[in-house]
Regions:
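Substrate-binding/catalytic cleft of secreted carbohydrate-active enzymes
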Residues: 236, 242-247, 251-390
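Accessory beta-strand-rich segments of carbohydrate-active enzymes
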Residues: 1-93, 117, 132, 259-262, ...
């Protein structure tokens, strides 16, 4: 039974992944549909709950076939969470952490997205960096006034001396504990996020530079399913995938061809695997009759936001991919969406480059020049003449 709590009256229902066309109902109220089965999403269900028994229903429709080129599974295949917060609280995915090197010193920036469902509220935002064992390293704070029934952003910037850097060889991690404390004694809201400190550069001449050193990527593509376990996401299975890659000598992975489970990214953070986090297998031109092409125009903005905002604090992610071997190749049908997608990613996260996999099968690469220009890093599929023959 649901017990109302005056100190934490706001309730959010969070879905990490439902394949597909997930339509959510709370006590008969239709909260809308989320078509893309690989996107995480959430609903504010506060207005629809009542004391006692409540009915939450999710209708899934995976009847439109063929909608993918690999095994998808169906239904609620990733975690579901019920999140209860005070009226003044952090929005879901409301903490963004970036690190950069300034005069050989690490600078940390925390951007907090704060919601206030009540009257104007003075508060203090506390951000504490700890070791994974809980040992406190430093604390920063900022006084804020949250306007009534508004969402606002607050930024904190501070130096982080003697930070241990994250890399595939030394995957050092920290925790950021952010606490919103109202000055009037109202309940505080706390969010804890794991992050790492690393510095990524790239150039045509030097390639990828991680923490000041050139690094070559020994990578592979991994789909979201877990073999005989199907598409259901179990923490141990996600970690096993990452562990097997690490033991086989890989130091990088591309999440083909959609955002992965959160547990897989956690494993990459802890084990030391660099990640290209990929959004879509295609844009407007179809590879299968009912694939993302029928959703693209209406949903790509929200699905990009879901991927970037959810995953941006993972130090393992060094690059965002906006597509895989898309059918569109020439301007304007390829170039305009590429600039729109890449631009939106950069607005959400200017700290990472944007790529996509372009496929010309070693022919006519020059037709890709206008499309390639929309990216920070160009993915060449496939440079077969560069590799050893079977």
């Amino acid at each position: 039974d649901f017990v109302p709590d005056s100190r934490r009256p706001e309730t959010t229902l969070y879905f990490e992944g439902v394949y597909m066309n997930a339509e959510v109902f709370v006590n008969g109220h239709n909260l809308g549909i989320r078509p893309y089965g690989y996107s995480s999403f959430y609903h504010d269900i506060t207005p629809y709950l009542k004391a006692g028994k409540n009915v939450i229903a999710v209708r899934v429709d995976n009847s439109g076939q063929k909608n993918c080129r690999w095994y998808t599974g169906s239904g609620i295949y990733r975690n579901v969470k019920l999140i209860r917060t005070p009226k003044a609280h952090f929005e879901p995915w409301g903490i963004g952490i970036t690190t950069e090197q300034v005069n050989r010193k690490t600078q940390v920036e925390v951007e907090a997205t704060l919601a206030n469902r009540d009257k104007d509220l003075p508060a203090t935002l506390l951000c504490t960096v700890t070791e994974l064992d809980g040992h406190t390293i430093l604390t920063q704070k900022e006084t804020v006034t949250l306007e009534a029934n508004r969402t606002s952003k607050v930024k904190l910037q501070f130096p982080f001396e003697n930070a241990k850097l994250w890399s595939p060889e030394t995957p050092n991690l920290y925790r950021m504990v952010c606490c919103l404390v109202p000055t009037n004694g109202e309940p505080a809201d706390t969010v804890t996020t794991t992050f790492g400190v690393r510095h990524v550069e790239y150039s045509a001449k030097k390639g990828l530079i991680l923490n000041g050193k050139a690094i070559e990527l020994n990578g592979g593509c991994v789909h979201h399913d877990n073999g005989p376990l199907g598409a259901a996401s179990y923490r141990d299975a996600e970690w096993r995938k990452a562990q097997l890659m690490k033991e086989a000598g890989f130091n990088a992975v591309r999440t083909s061809h959609n955002p992965p489970a959160e547990a897989f990214l956690d494993a990459c953070d802890h084990l030391g695997l660099l990640v290209i986090d990929e959004s879509f297998d295609g844009w407007r031109s179809a590879k299968t009759p009912k694939d993302y092409s029928i959703l693209f125009d209406r949903w790509w903005t929200k699905d990009i936001e879901s991927m970037v905002l959810r995953d941006r604090n993972h130090p393992s992610i060094f690059c965002w991919s906006i597509g895989n071997e898309i059918i569109e190749r020439k301007p304007p049908e390829a170039v305009l969406p590429a600039y729109a997608l890449a631009g939106h990613v950069r607005r959400l996260d200017p700290s990472r480059p944007v790529t996509s996999a372009l496929a010309a099968w070693d022919k006519d690469w020059e037709i890709y020049d206008p499309l390639a220009a929309a990216h920070d890093i160009v993915g060449y599929n496939y440079m077969m003449h560069k590799g050893p023959s079977d």
